[in-house]
Amino acid sequence: MEARAIAKYIRMSPTKVGVILDLIRGKQVNEAFAILQYTPREAAVVINKVLKSAVANAENNLELNADNLYVSECFVGQGSTLKRFQPHAQGRAFKILKKTSNITVVVKERA
């Protein structure tokens, strides 16, 4: 049995989020929370919330024990991009792309 949680349109680059997800993939849930708590990145705060949601889904919807859960899958996809323009000299305008992320965390019970 698996439980999942998804956070969509997080205003953060998928590249920066992916680095933090690599740290917790395959780890026990308690160990993953400890890693995220001491990781000094903005993405760690968001991933911590998504992981808490996935654990809550497992406990409440599937009645799984939180002590036996591990992070089986976690990945990030690119969300929609906000397009902005930065005015420059002599009437020019440069495009700024503000990327968003869709974060998915899946937890399973160890057999």
From Swiss-Prot:
Keywords per UniProt: Ribonucleoprotein, Ribosomal protein, RNA-binding, rRNA-binding
Pfam families in the record: Ribosomal_L22 (PF00237)
Cysteine disulfide links: none
CDD domains per record: Ribosomal_L22
Annotated Gene Ontology cellular component terms: cytosolic large ribosomal subunit
Highest taxon above the source species: Bacteria
Alphabetical list of InterPro entries matching this protein: Ribosomal_uL22, Ribosomal_uL22_bac/chlpt-type, Ribosomal_uL22_bac/org-type, Ribosomal_uL22_CS, Ribosomal_uL22_sf
Entries under SUPFAM superfamilies matching the protein: Ribosomal protein L22
Family: Belongs to the universal ribosomal protein uL22 family.
Protein role: This protein binds specifically to 23S rRNA; its binding is stimulated by other ribosomal proteins, e.g. L4, L17, and L20. It is important during the early stages of 50S assembly. It makes multiple contacts with different domains of the 23S rRNA in the assembled 50S subunit and ribosome.
Quaternary assembly: Part of the 50S ribosomal subunit.
PANTHER family membership: CHLOROPLAST 50S RIBOSOMAL PROTEIN L22-RELATED, LARGE RIBOSOMAL SUBUNIT PROTEIN UL22M
Descriptive protein name: Large ribosomal subunit protein uL22
Lineage, uppermost ranks: Bacteria, Bacillati, Bacillota, Clostridia, Eubacteriales
